Amino acid sequence: MLYLLKKLKHIDSYGESNLSMFYLKFYCPWKLCPLLPILYGRNKSVQNAWSCHKLHRFIDFPTPSANMNFFFFIRVCYGTVSLFISTFLKKISFFIYVNFTVYF
């Protein structure tokens, strides 16, 4: 863990630590969804982390528009809902597959 933190602590092209991007990438949809618009407006490192290219692909939504706070919130909620639905459907389909192959 210490090695990972040291590796992420280098300064990125925006002049901020990559630690905030790491935190958003792994905790963004599940833990921070209601808080992100507030943090995005006030915290410079969160803004820089969100504009990172990897995080754009992680939530997979079109590029942000002029009204950043509104579209940022929609993008995060879209990512949360799509991840939840895909995970739920995978678990349900696996459950149905196992039950029908074992009992029939």
Curated annotation (Swiss-Prot):
It comes from the Eukaryota. This is Uncharacterized protein YCR001W.
